[in-house]
């Protein structure tokens, strides 16, 4: 009992007297996050009041982690992304496609894009592959990481592309990710 009391007293002395400044500084830390918003630009007119540049309404599709399945639920995430991709393609909308991989007509996976983008894809934060990994190695690692088994190669690449974009842009509660810009009102209504 005396040993336990002595140990507790020593810890209290260490926290309250010896390392007081360190623990006080840790107690006073603040956490904050920044959300960037694009401001609307006003109309630009000439000296006579004639419009040179006007505003128009545009829609963006933004994924927000608060309303998206958790990282553990890859199957549900993939289903949502698959449905969004089908909707975008049906309505001929463009969406984020930054994955530096493509599938050729013969079905082979090839690199596409800049060397820096390919190196980023292979790094430890993304697919965690060695620099000498082939395009097929990257594709297979993407399928495994995002659990995209069960889809054909072309569809898996499209889903993997959006999942890669979410990872690349650090998708989280504080950081929503835009996957499509300037989409039609019809597409927004369908979502």
Give, region by region, the residue ranges found by the protein language model.
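Membrane-proximal periplasmic segments of bacterial cell-envelope enzymes
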Residues: 1-191
């Amino acid at each position: 009992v005396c040993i336990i009391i002595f140990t507790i007293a020593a810890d209290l002395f260490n926290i309250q007297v010896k390392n007081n400044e360190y623990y006080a500084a840790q107690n006073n830390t603040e956490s904050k996050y920044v959300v960037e918003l694009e401001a609307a630009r006003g109309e630009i007119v000439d000296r006579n009041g004639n419009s040179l540049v006007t505003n128009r309404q545009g829609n963006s599709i933004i994924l927000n982690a608060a309303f998206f399945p958790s990282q553990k639920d890859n199957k549900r995430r993939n289903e949502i992304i698959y449905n969004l991709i089908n909707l975008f393609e049906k309505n001929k909308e463009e969406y984020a496609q930054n994955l530096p991989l493509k599938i050729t007509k013969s079905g082979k996976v090839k690199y596409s894009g800049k060397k820096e983008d390919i190196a980023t894809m292979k790094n430890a934060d993304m697919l965690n592959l060695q620099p000498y990994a082939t395009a097929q190695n990257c594709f297979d690692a993407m399928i495994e990481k995002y659990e995209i088994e069960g889809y054909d190669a072309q569809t898996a690449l499209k889903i993997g592309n959006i999942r890669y974009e979410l990872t690349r842009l650090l998708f989280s509660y504080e950081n929503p990710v835009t996957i499509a810009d300037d989409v039609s009102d019809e597409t927004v209504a369908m979502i």
